[in-house]
Amino acid sequence: MAYAVVRVRGSVGVRGDIADTMKMLRLHRVNHCVIIPDTEHYTGMIKKVKDYVTYGEIDKDTLVALILKRGRLPGNKRLSEELVKELTELPVEELAEKVIAGEIKIKDTPIKPVFRLHPPRKGYDRAGVKKGFSIGGALGYRSGKINDLLNKMM
């Protein structure tokens, strides 16, 4: 299983240790997204920054769309299905399955590990970006609903 982590809040007033954890996760700007495996180390990092990000389990279809629409190569070159197959020797769907299963990490491929997204169309549909998802906000764990958010942001 893999998590999609999206930075929702900015950097003003962030404690130093949380800012360092954001840098380690490569979440330098708002609306940046990373795909990380479900390991003990990453889980601890996510818990530390949960008040500044939203995260959940990404599904295969959303990951394929994310790679093709917002994935980039060094030099800001766009990706296509043929280019992904040529560079990784795997079709996009199979690459997505292996990333979700934890067999491959995005950072081990030529694809840039950070996906730069738009702000969500029609907003977060919630009470704002300063409250947790469970009480009506946009922050924290949102399980499978992260896929709906990512589709609004692509």
UniProtKB/Swiss-Prot annotation:
One of its GO terms (cellular component) is cytosolic large ribosomal subunit. PROSITE patterns: RIBOSOMAL_L30. PANTHER family: 60S RIBOSOMAL PROTEIN L7, LARGE RIBOSOMAL SUBUNIT PROTEIN UL30. One of its GO terms (molecular function) is RNA binding. Belongs to the universal ribosomal protein uL30 family. It comes from the Archaea. GO terms for biological process: maturation of LSU-rRNA from tricistronic rRNA transcript (SSU-rRNA, 5.8S rRNA, LSU-rRNA); translation. This is Large ribosomal subunit protein uL30. The gene is rpl30. Part of the 50S ribosomal subunit. Signal peptide: none annotated. Keywords: Ribonucleoprotein, Ribosomal protein. InterPro entries: Ribo_uL30_ferredoxin-like_sf (IPR036919), Ribosomal_uL30 (IPR039699), Ribosomal_uL30_arc (IPR005997), Ribosomal_uL30_CS (IPR018038), Ribosomal_uL30_euk_arc (IPR035808), Ribosomal_uL30_ferredoxin-like (IPR016082).
